[in-house]
Amino acid sequence: MANRPTELAAFIRSSGEADGWIEESFKEPYVAFNPDVLMYNDTLFNELLLSAHALKINSIQDVQSDDTVEDAGDIGNEVIHSELVTFIETAADVYALDRQCLVCRVLDMYRRNFGLSALWMADYAFLCSKCLGSPPCATATFIAAFEFVYIMDKHFLSDHGCTLVRSFGKKLLTLEDIQRHFFLHGCFRTDGGVPGRRHDEVITSRSKQGRLVGRRGKFSTAGDAKVLYSNYSYLAQSATRALLMTLSDLGSAPLEVIEGRQKSISGDVRNELRDGIESRKRVAHVIHSVGPVHSCPTTLSVALAGWKDCAKNVECNFFQLESCTLRASSEDNDYEHEWELRASEEKLNVVENVQDMQQIDASQCEHHEHARNEDCTMGYGNLVLLLLAGTGSAPEAASELAFMAAKVRRETVDIFWKNHRREFANDVTAAYSACYGEDSEPDLELGPLMITQLKHAITKGGTSAECLLCNLLLIRTYWLAMRKFKRDIITYSANNIGLFHSIEPVLDAWRSQGHRTDLGDEGCFVTLMKSAGTEAIYKHLFCDPMCAARIAQTNPRSLFDHPDATNHDELALYKARLASQNHFEGRVCAGLWALAYTFKTYQVFPPRPTALSAFVKDAGALLQRHSISLISLEHTLGVYV
């Protein structure tokens, strides 16, 4: 330990420095996507919560005229100006195709200096498997980031004195790196973007598949699987980068006016502004609602124009008889049926084990049933609310739960920033150094957008970029509930009542008929659905290709059906099998994801009418090949986001 290489210096725990892990954190076997793990380290939790926020740099500018700011007063007035450009441009660099993955770099550094044990490989394989079975969303990214740090510290902190705690605060790692590694590009995947495909496979050209070309009788090829997948990855990362860059426009407006004061933004003035001094006047400027029509970067425009060819090369249908989504739907139906049978059998066992049924009431019977069917993933409900409350996904005014969660998040991030900014600023990566000065602070009103999948703040038609319902898919009880909820909407009326107008009555029925008792969450599910809003529910269940892809990607067997920590031997065997097989493939082909990313990008950067018409036609054909029925793509493109 005395001769550790300098490349690991940033991760070496200083003498007397606390890493935040509670006692017994590393004693139990690791179970991926376990809510209990989040309670092992409050410091890391708050660090990731801070990292989910963009950092704005404040400055004071003189007001030159009354036209600059309404009611600004005399010439001596000053305006607090806040800019996000510095932070956003630095963060967006993660999505450059030729930029090294920092998660891979950390893994390589640890491998070269310490070696990677079989036990570590088993834990890492478990995390990768869970990420592949999860919908790419804010909650999944937060969990992956926390548990990646956990398994690295579990295996290397005690023996080698290296920790990844504080690496996000110092920007040695970012949530964008986690998203890129585990969800967007998937550096550990082995399928070349198509389930069943090998990463080193040479793909036969689709248009001439089966034909012999030339005298030598060779097949025409579309290219190597890795090359074709890299083209898709470029499209997805370029779209994400462009959507993220729209945030840089939000910091261009003045936020506060101070009459006749000559003060630095640092020090007491920030506290006075936060406390609401009487001398300030807020500028009436709305920046987070329906966004302006942004201009699409030229390189992205070219990539989007070629999305169809990109998608064809990484689409499943041309290589298999059954589409990836059709198989996923069949597997989901089987799992739901098996779970219902299992739940019925356990309920029957509860009744049979009761010696005298007359001496216990229905609530006691229900308690025994829930004890047998306890869903450990229910703990993620609070995390979903903490991350999305107060954003367009769950507005504060929608429910008291959302209001309180947003308040707690803002207070937590604000306090953590004040307590740790100086510490982080001393060792922060050079690219982010300007964002850690006295004049900088997290943008609490913008919220944790850096952890969302699409990373823009535009809201439209009662919807926003991050879908609350997609985040709830990580919870087994809610995954099952949403399937039943959708069926109830479809079967609500035998007449031709629109699906949109069936949502509110079904929500009311779920609330009044006691479905909350069946879910065992005291009505939280219905409250969250109400918070999301009718439009967001409609978009998620019936309209949005991205939501459809996330639903298909969510693998209940991978997420919920595995040994737990009480079965040590079975759990160890399960993880060892994952690591030894080295078989990590997505449930949904990259062709469908290419469509989804193009669709979401066109919602923010609308194409010309001719290009839009061609896109809707081609997108409809791809969705039909995947047996996905959605309502009016052109409507969703223009009305929702």
From Swiss-Prot:
Alphabetic keyword roster: Host cytoplasm, Host nucleus, Metal-binding, Zinc, Zinc-finger
Chain residues that bind Zn(2+) 2: 467, 470, 540, 547
Pfam families reported for this sequence: Herpes_env
Chief location of this protein within or outside the cell: host cell
Subcellular location: Host cytoplasm; Host nucleus
Region Zinc finger 2, residue ranges: 467-547
Binding residue positions for Zn(2+) 1: 101, 104, 181, 187
Region listing for Zinc finger 1, in residue ranges: 101-187
PROSITE patterns found in the cross-reference section: HERPESVIRUS_UL32 (PS51988)
GO cellular component: host cell cytoplasm; host cell nucleus; viral envelope
Molecular function GO terms recorded: zinc ion binding
Chain's role: Plays a role in efficient localization of neo-synthesized capsids to nuclear replication compartments, thereby controlling cleavage and packaging of virus genomic DNA.
Family of this protein: Belongs to the herpesviridae UL32 protein family.
Protein name (record): Packaging protein UL32 homolog
Organism: Gallid herpesvirus 2 (strain Chicken/Md5/ATCC VR-987) (GaHV-2)
